[in-house]
From Swiss-Prot:
Functional note: Digests double-stranded RNA. Involved in the processing of primary rRNA transcript to yield the immediate precursors to the large and small rRNAs (23S and 16S). Processes some mRNAs, and tRNAs when they are encoded in the rRNA operon. Processes pre-crRNA and tracrRNA of type II CRISPR loci if present in the organism.
Chief location bin: cytoplasm
Protein name, UniProt field: Ribonuclease 3
First-tier enzyme category under EC: hydrolase
Cofactor field: Mg(2+)
A molecular function GO annotation: rRNA binding
Binding site for Mg(2+): 49, 122, 125
Cellular component GO terms, alphabetical: cytoplasm
Compartments, as annotated in UniProt: Cytoplasm
Chain ranges of the RNase III domain: 7-136
Region (Disordered): 207-228
Active-site residues per Swiss-Prot or TrEMBL entry: 53, 125
Gene: rnc
Chain ranges of the DRBM domain: 162-228
Amino acid sequence: MVSTKFLNKLKNEYNIEFNNEKLLEEAFTHSSYSNEHPDDGIRDYEKLEFLGDAVLELAVSNYLYRHYPKLNEGELTRLRSNIVRTEGFSEFAIECGFQKEIHLGNGEEKAGARNRKTLLEDVFEAFNGALFLDQGMPAVERFLHLTVYPLIAKGEFDDSRDYKTDLQELLQQNGPVNIEYSVISESQLPSHFVVELKINDQVQTQGEGHNKKAAEQQAAKAALQKFE
């Protein structure tokens, strides 16, 4: 069973209460657990993952179409790909408290599967598949408005410009320059990184993001605005 603490988190932070809690249990059940505990009668999350993958792609596509009217089809596709890749959804799974609720078989638990990014991505997709079946697309959209969409709006998935490369090329026009990125703050719940950018050992800017890469890009972007 999922914990009471987690159910309260869903209710208080995301305003989610499942009508059919068996769907929620299924969303967090790995095949290794269901194989080891057949008498529990809980299916694994693979079919919900299949559904959730399609639900999330549709929801994100709809959001991008409505909020980024100036992007062409190729740019929208690239941005959507950045959002739905493994690393992004795995971090959301951790932030939402899914990681601790996953039911794993003994072998997978010992192998560290609970920290495996691909598994966490699967669980995030399965949860959204379960939420879709339980309450429909509007509930999924409300959940994403509290989790995924704010980071899209902040530009954390936009790689249309590589600020780090642009900064390096700008600064090295007149010779070698030492550019250093250092993580000065990191938290997991929610995932949040602060990176400090030094140029020739002098602190220039800081950047924040949901992962190290995003924070580095934000620090480089701030430096470009400073030097351009």
